[in-house]
Curated annotation (Swiss-Prot):
The keyword Transferase applies. The modification S-(dipyrrolylmethanemethyl)cysteine is found at residue 235. It comes from Alkaliphilus oremlandii (strain OhILAs). Its cofactor is dipyrromethane. This is Porphobilinogen deaminase. Its EC number is 2.5.1.61. PANTHER family: PORPHOBILINOGEN DEAMINASE (PTHR11557:SF0). GO terms for cellular component: cytoplasm. SUPFAM superfamilies: Periplasmic binding protein-like II, Porphobilinogen deaminase (hydroxymethylbilane synthase), C-terminal domain. InterPro entries: HemC, Porphobilin_deaminase_cofac_BS, Porphobilin_deaminase_N, Porphobilinogen_deaminase_C, Porphobilinogen_deaminase_C_sf. GO terms for biological process: protoporphyrinogen IX biosynthetic process.
């Protein structure tokens, strides 16, 4: 049996694919595996922010096509990069255990303390709006490119600091670059941040992923995505969600930024099995409160 694994060609994407490949080999060492890497539109168009050029789907478009063309059997993505609408013929078939979902501040290699004379580089409005509450006197500007490209821009002196996902730096073995870890109470992570997701063609036998799939990460991710979807959150939308499970209860925190850039945050707790419904209801509550306040 041979499995062809499709991946973006960035170092982090390949590392995440290798995590999936390792799980498949652990399940059955006799399975032959081929890693097929490719550039996506999102990797090529780096001169504009994602919301200006089509959103998160730009990171999966070419990989989806490779699945349709039978050039690969499964594809691997960061779940936070997945659009809300998933092709019914290319379903999500497994998710990884969640890596640390927090965001971090990274300084240039030779710098110990930030001076903020230059902007903080930031890839999303979600991070930007929360960073501005922590560093109100600092400028926050967009930065694009994969993790290593962003670090190069930082070390060249284009920014005083940049924000990244801790999970990516950890998977790349670059934890020493971290200057500050933001708690989820300071910067609420993107929905599904830290989770690796696998897609396949509908009906394709993915029993080799049975040990890889993490049910807790799945339940949390479904609740977080339900919240974002209900608020029509795209790649750079000022929307975030973070869930935790304890004793079969899910605690879900949502963040929503209204049209006047006011930040709304709310937390609810409910039964784990009702996660998607919780995400939907939390979004409606926050949207309703915003509309009520807007009429005052």
């Amino acid at each position: 049996m041979k499995i062809r694994v499709g991946s973006r060609e960035s170092k982090l994407a390949v590392k995440q694919s290798e995590i999936v490949i390792e799980a498949i080999r652990k399940y059955d060492p006799n399975i032959e595996i081929e890693l097929v890497t490719m550039k996506t539109t999102g990797d090529i168009k780096l001169d504009q922010t994602l919301d200006k050029i089509g959103g998160k789907g730009l990171f999966i478009k070419e990989l989806d096509q490779a699945l349709y063309d039978d050039r690969v059997d499964i594809t691997v993505h960061s779940f936070k990069d997945m659009p809300m609408a998933i092709d019914e013929y290319l379903p999500i078939v497994a998710v990884s255990k969640r890596e640390d979902p927090r965001d971090v501040l990274v300084l240039p290699k030779t710098v110990k303390e930030p001076d903020f004379s230059k902007p903080i580089g930031c890839s999303s409005f979600r991070r930007k709006i929360q960073l501005q509450e922590i560093y109100p006197h600092c400028s926050v500007e967009p930065i694009r490119g994969n993790v290593l490209t962003r670090l190069e821009k930082l070390d060249r002196g284009e920014f005083s600091a940049i924000t990244l996902a801790l999970a990516g730096l950890k998977r790349l073995g670059l934890e020493e670059r971290i200057s500050r870890i933001f708690e989820v109470t300071e910067i609420l992570p993107a929905a599904c941040q830290g989770v690796i997701v696998v897609q396949a063609r509908k009906g394709f036998d993915v029993s080799f992923l049975s040990d890889f799939h993490d049910k807790e990460a799945w339940d949390i991710s479904m609740a977080e995505r339900s919240f974002v979807r209900t608020l029509n959150g795209g790649c750079s939308s000022p929307v975030a969600a973070y869930g935790e499970i304890k004793d079969n209860y899910l605690t879900l925190t949502g963040l929503y930024v209204d049209s006047s850039n006011s930040v709304h945050k709310k937390t609810i707790t409910g039964a784990r099995k009702q996660g998607e419904e919780m995400g939907f209801n939390l979004a409606l509550q926050m949207k309703g409160e915003d509309e009520v306040h807007g009429k005052d």
